[in-house]
């Protein structure tokens, strides 16, 4: 998480170094949970600092940093763009988590269209109808979803947007609750 450089600054740089050594092309992160003792303006200074340091390491190793919508600032398209625009680096891109984007109350498809040119990874997470009814617009994300295609998201549309709008091949990492759901 980028808001806490004293805790996670070295961790993200280590993750990038390891990724570069073992051939992993993308690492993902978010801003993390807000500290109680900082203001929003201070948080963005901390995020910028951490992201600049991480981008410097990532550029030298050919690793991309995927910014994920998962917390208080990145839960909207405007907030994620604000973080993305803090540091100009070819190493920084977007990891759109479709489930988190949906649960935040945003239009997943419009958001995906907007970030497609910057997309470096996609967390393929579907959300069940009951999960949607209980949490949409109330949370910034969830660690697990349901099997892709069994929830509220239109996967044919998502795949079509990625194929048509992304300038690179994109890995879809499936995030669901069980191995059986992942196999579907």
Question: Where do the protein language model's features map onto the residues?
Answer:
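Acidic/histidine-rich catalytic cores of soluble enzymes
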Residues: 49-152
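A short, acidic, flexible beta-alpha connecting loop/helix-capping segment that sits on the rim
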Residues: 173-183
């Amino acid at each position: 998480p980028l808001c806490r450089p004293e805790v996670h600054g070295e961790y993200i740089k280590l993750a990038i170094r390891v990724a570069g050594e073992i051939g992993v092309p993308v690492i993902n992160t978010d801003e993390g949970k807000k500290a109680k003792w900082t203001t929003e303006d201070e948080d963005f200074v901390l995020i910028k600092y951490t992201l600049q340091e991480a981008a410097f390491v990532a550029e030298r190793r050919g690793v991309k940093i995927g910014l994920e919508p998962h917390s208080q600032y990145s839960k909207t398209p405007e907030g994620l763009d604000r973080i993305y625009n803090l540091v100009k680096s070819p190493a920084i891109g977007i990891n759109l988590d479709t489930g988190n984007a949906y649960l935040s109350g945003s239009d997943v498809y419009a958001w995906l269209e907007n970030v497609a040119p910057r997309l470096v990874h996609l967390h393929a997470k579907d959300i069940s109808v009951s999960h949607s009814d209980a949490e949409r617009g109330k949370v910034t994300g969830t660690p697990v979803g349901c099997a892709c295609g069994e929830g509220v998201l239109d996967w044919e549309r998502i795949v079509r947007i990625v194929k048509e709008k992304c300038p690179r091949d994109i890995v879809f990492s499936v995030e669901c609750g069980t191995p059986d759901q992942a196999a579907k």
